[in-house]
Amino acid sequence: MDSQRNLLVIALLFVSFMIWQAWEQDKNPQPQTQQTTQTTTTAAGSAADQGVPASGQGKMITVKTDVLDLTINTRGGDVEQALLPAYPKELGSNEPFQLLETTPQFIYQAQSGLTGRDGPDNPANGPRPLYNVEKEAFVLADGQNELQVPMTYTDAAGNTFTKTFVFKRGDYAVNVNYSVQNAGEKPLEVSTFGQLKQSVNLPPHRDTGSSNFALHTFRGAAYSTPDEKYEKYKFDTIADNENLNVSSKGGWVAMLQQYFATAWIPRNDGTNNFYTANLGNGIVAIGYKAQPVLVQPGQTGAMTSTLWVGPEIQDKMAAVAPHLDLTVDYGWLWFISQPLFKLLKWIHSFVGNWGFSIIIITFIVRGIMYPLTKAQYTSMAKMRMLQPKIQAMRERLGDDKQRQSQEMMALYKAEKVNPLGGCFPLIIQMPIFLALYYMLMGSIELRHAPFALWIHDLSAQDPYYILPILMGVTMFFIQKMSPTTVTDPMQQKIMTFMPVIFTVFFLWFPSGLVLYYIVSNLVTIIQQQLIYRGLEKRGLHSREKKKS
């Protein structure tokens, strides 16, 4: 095993990873079940099956804070539009990113209210409540840290239901407080609910290109319970009426996409039911229903929940609810990606540039992995030294493969050489590289983050393809500087074209990821020369490259 064959191993691992990404994107996995979780299939799959009504037309009111620009329908009090002023739709654009939307082309809403036997949102009790508001536009004024948007509804029996949205400066978490005044002579039984519904298919104006082979990130639903910290639930699974039905205390439900998320977090000590539903017309939902609460005659009951609507900022999400920060799509290597991101963020706090932070973390990671790299090159050098003996043995034994294998293993044992010693360090390093891939792909902090010169967005591909070409050049130099024992003509051709193949692959990768690989390759060249000098002193390497 030598350095050029390592390139082939890397290529195979890389292609395998891409195939796995495509498979993950296409398949419809069944949610894992645990003791307190059960998954059922519902035929109708409608929100009404869960006791949650469909929304209707009311008056639209607007709410503006320093970080949110929402439109709320007074019919039910659903959030039908959500703009994020701090995050432009595109680099250089003054148009804010739109997370929630209600148009003929696309539906994405955050619904909430009071259902249950006596809840005004129970379909059995008639249309959804038409709330009264004191004005049609609410604005968080300068110097104001909190904004409350109260909405009231009084039913035919004289019971008053108040739904109050509470916004805080700089916060994407919105508290939704409910007050129920029982004016009757019998207890009122009500349950809070929160539901997120969205069109499965993206229209052109919503498709950010994050589903291509290089930029695939998860878009779908998710939930969390004390037993299951973070479980994804694909939209296609919901559309197939294979629906979720989980009873749990605590937790949350969410809808995710690259960089942004919405989530409902129930705030109560009771049991909540988490569900998904196929609403028809290409729309799916995930939501929760809280355990019923009794409000006695003449009394006032209070309930609350929290809506997250905004970017996936890990530290802020973690402060809102346990494990909500796991919605950042770091894939199955999140336990490596999260510490790497914390390190990257710490470095950024000093240098102030995410591109330079990536360069520094690359040096740190490669420095930590240097002992593995050295062991890999040492093992390969020992294998090269044995090649003359192995070749002579093959000529002596001819086609006797069994004796060849036996004597080769005896030779390895006598020379204290592990034939897989060059592979193991490489395989151990791959999860770290993949974790960096997920980290750079899923971190909102890198969205529209500039580096230098022509790189104005580290989360987007290089518009001039300069970085991918530089990456290919560094691979070419690594290949030319590496000793080789490859004699097979086909393998030689593959090695020759490997830098070109990787360059083509990386044309569509985010600039931040390509920058990492360029710096990593440069570090490889430096480490390679240092290791070769040490091997020369031990007689395990010669500067004169063997001809094949």
UniProtKB/Swiss-Prot annotation:
GO molecular function: membrane insertase activity
The protein's assembly and partners: Interacts with the Sec translocase complex via SecD. Specifically interacts with transmembrane segments of nascent integral membrane proteins during membrane integration.
Name of protein: Membrane protein insertase YidC
Superkingdom, natural source: Bacteria
Compartmental location: Cell inner membrane
Family: Belongs to the OXA1/ALB3/YidC family. Type 1 subfamily.
Chain residue ranges for the region called Disordered: 28-56
InterPro entries: Membr_insert_YidC, Membr_insert_YidC_N, YidC/ALB3/OXA1/COX18, YidC/Oxa/ALB_C, YidC_ALB_C, YidC_periplasmic_sf
Swiss-Prot/TrEMBL GO biological process terms: protein insertion into membrane; protein transport
Stored PANTHER family: CYTOCHROME C OXIDASE ASSEMBLY PROTEIN COX18, MITOCHONDRIAL (PTHR12428:SF65), OXA1 (PTHR12428)
Any GO CC annotation of this UniProt entry: plasma membrane
HAMAP family: YidC_type1
Gene3D superfamilies: 2.70.98.90
Reported function: Required for the insertion and/or proper folding and/or complex formation of integral membrane proteins into the membrane. Involved in integration of membrane proteins that insert both dependently and independently of the Sec translocase complex, as well as at least some lipoproteins. Aids folding of multispanning membrane proteins.
CDD domains (alphabetical): 5TM_YidC_Alb3, EcYidC-like_peri
Main location (coarse class): membrane
Compositionally biased tracts (Low complexity): 29-42
This protein's UniProt keywords: Cell inner membrane, Cell membrane, Chaperone, Membrane, Protein transport, Transmembrane, Transmembrane helix, Transport
Transmembrane segments: 6-26, 350-370, 424-444, 458-478, 499-519
Membrane topology classification: Multi-pass membrane protein
